[in-house]
Amino acid sequence: MVNSKWSSMKNILFILSIFLCVEGFSQEAFAFFTQNGKRTSYRKLLRKSKKADIVLFGEYHNNPIAHWLEVKLTKDLLGKRSLILGAEMFERDNQDALDGYLQGTIDQKGLDTLARLWKNYKTDYKPWVDLAKREKLPIVATNIPRKYANLVYKKGLQALDTLPSAERKWIVSLPFPYDGNLSQYEKMKKMARHNPENLPMAQAIKDATMAESIETHYKKGSLFLHLNGSYHSDFFQGIYWYLRKRNPNLKILTISTLSQSSLKKLSSEAYGQADFILVVDEDMTGSY
């Protein structure tokens, strides 16, 4: 009990320290920019988010400021319209366990046992999930189970044809469109030490599955806020590209996270990366 209280106190102190930075410390911890490199604000991001159908919040998985802003944005969107949440961090076949936790039929220990939680879940995602639980918000487990993405990486997309029908519900409906010439997938080919053609395919099946999950659960008039790694939606590709393929009429807003040594201006390489780009001081400590 003492350790739990101390952990909560540390979280509160950390959040307060961020507020102090925002309220006037000379050394800023983060800044927002538009895709054209113009300095902007959280207030404008919030205003634009309220008008979107879908918001893709691209994060650095170990960045505490991104995680804090995810919670803040969720809170600020409460009550405006029907709010639906979704996250890369939960895989489709863990939906029942996640629902059980949100509905109170299983506790945290049960969720730990039944779901494949990320190693940084308790520090980085539990506050967001618990907010959803308190506010009775649904969270959609959007991602493909990792073992199927690994199968694509090792053997290519054709390996999915061997899956039994009972397992195909965990992945995007086949066949799905794939464009290996998209710039983000091209970068992955260059980064790959092994199977350079298969690596972007494994990424694409994640992107396509998450997009299908989002579009399937989105309801007209609602707002869907989705958390994912920045690479999954940067430069209006990945999840964004697949959502556009599925429904070109959706109003989609993208957020990306970036680390820089200076917050004075946006790096030219990041122009066009997202509608709003969260730039964090590169000296910011990571959660792992």
Put a short name on every predicted segment.
Residues 2-12:
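Positively charged n-region of N-terminal signal peptides that target proteins for export
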Residues 12-21:
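Sec-dependent N-terminal signal peptides
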Residues 25-52:
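N- or domain-start disorder-to-order transition segments that initiate the globular core
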Residues 50-83, 89:
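N-terminal, post-signal-peptide region of Sec/Tat-exported proteins
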Residues 60-64, 90-94, 145-149, 230-233, ...:
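Solvent-exposed loop/turn segments at secondary-structure junctions
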Residues 84-91, 254-257:
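Short internal beta-strands
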Residues 97-217:
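A substrate-binding/cap region within the structured catalytic cores of diverse enzymes
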Residues 209, 215-218, 232-288:
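C-terminal regions of proteins
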